[in-house]
From Swiss-Prot:
CDD domains: GATase1_GMP_Synthase, GMP_synthase_C. InterPro entries: Class_I_gatase-like (IPR029062), GATASE (IPR017926), GMP_synth_C (IPR001674), GMP_synth_GATase (IPR004739), GMP_synthase (IPR022955), GMPS_ATP_PPase_dom (IPR025777), Rossmann-like_a/b/a_fold (IPR014729). Homodimer. HAMAP family: GMP_synthase. PANTHER family: GMP SYNTHASE [GLUTAMINE-HYDROLYZING], GMP SYNTHASE-RELATED. ATP binds at S226, G227, G228, V229, D230, S231, S232. Residues 9-198 form the Glutamine amidotransferase type-1 domain. Catalyzes the synthesis of GMP from XMP. Its EC number is 6.3.5.2. It catalyses: XMP + L-glutamine + ATP + H2O = GMP + L-glutamate + AMP + diphosphate + 2 H(+). One of its GO terms (cellular component) is cytosol. The active site is at C86, H172, E174. This is GMP synthase [glutamine-hydrolyzing].
Amino acid sequence: MEMAQEQELILVLDFGSQYNQLITRRIREMGVYSELHDHEISVDEIKRMNPKGIILSGGPNSVYEEGSFTIDPEIYNLGIPVLGICYGMQLTTKLLGGKVERANEREYGKAIINAKSDELFFGLPAEQTVWMSHSDKVIEIPDGFEVIADSPSTNYAAIEDKKRRIYGVQFHPEVRHTEYGNDLLRNFVRRVCECTGEWTMENFIDIEVEKIRKRVGDRKVLCAMSGGVDSSVVAVLLHKAIGDQLTCIFVDHGLLRKGEGDMVMEQFGEGFDMNIIRVNAQERFMDKLKGVSDPEQKRKIIGNEFVYVFDDEAAKLTDVDFLAQGTLYTDVIESGTKTAQTIKSHHNVGGLPEDMEFELIEPINTLFKDEVRALGIELGIPEHLVWRQPFPGPGLGIRVLGEITEDKLEIVRESDAILREVVREEGLERDIWQYFTVLPGIQSVGVMGDYRTYDHTVGIRAVTSIDGMTSDFARIDWEVLQKISSRIVNEVDHVNRVVYDITSKPPSTIEWE
């Protein structure tokens, strides 16, 4: 992958740690660009990238297991500072002539270390709390190394070879549980690697615009726009770079939130003066979904039909050379390293036809989600759009459980609009990671006025999370929930009951289908 910035880089090598993305994010938060790459990267490739420093991540393996992950030892002779974290420290010890052995028992959780005031621990207290997670332990350090931190359970909590600027820590500085973890990483990045920290969204835009113009020239780009944050930011960035050479296709499948289709056209078509083709394909999608209740089948139909509609519209355009996509850095990481774990497939509609003769352009594929939001703000996209709720590709199609009908879509659309309005009024938008309503397909007896009803139940799902991999239900104030419930049953036809989902992930997922 081409580096997003022709400037300071901290290279993180992946050994399978669940925290490897966190390392990259922590470095970027310091204003220094960082990328995560497979541990099998060659020395020549590292030389080409010219990083200011290299971090070796942790990992679940033992350095003595058959087939355990390793690196080319020549990396230590490049004159580039190296920091090994947990497995990275054990591997460094082994490759440079020290000794590592299996510990009697796995050390997992908080521990107290005593550190010396050297480059890594500069300005930090001697005694500090760290997060350990390892089953191997260093029993002898290589020649040229000295101990710079110990703990009650290990003499080698941190080590250094100051002359070669090679460091190792047996704990995880990237996690919040490590008291001064960010400070330690900052010391490595700023003091040891001598990075200045000038990576910002503003200079990212300047460099990316220049790259896009250089690559595209006078040719044309096509962008599939969903109205979501990622595709919107991609479209605005491309428009800033190449103007009228960009055409966006917005497929309105009728499964959008209330007013969303019109909002896309107003905010981006008119507000940014972009060329957007809106395809009203509601009837086409509903015909295909008629009688279908299985969630996987619904996803497949919606995804395939999106491709067919997009393909039909793209075929009407001439002289288009590039197809733009809102691929994020997390997608690149998950598909690009040998240590990546297979996870549940994303809801986002993908799989555009392989026979489309376009070059792919992915201008935000080096950014995490929060960085994409920051980029959107820097590009002038209104804050309320940048911070909109995540929305799955199949849209409301997976928030209506069972068969989809226009009446059911209307219930979800209206109830969801009420939920979002109340959350906004109460100032909870940034406190709740994701929130929406679902129609679970349950009808129950109720009383409205003097009449008996037998109507639908609406479920409210609201969760707190950091990255969506795990989540807990949001502790919304009861009075706020009561306000939401009262408005839904009074303002949305055919609803007489509202329930609140108090399940965490795992065991449940955030979406119901």
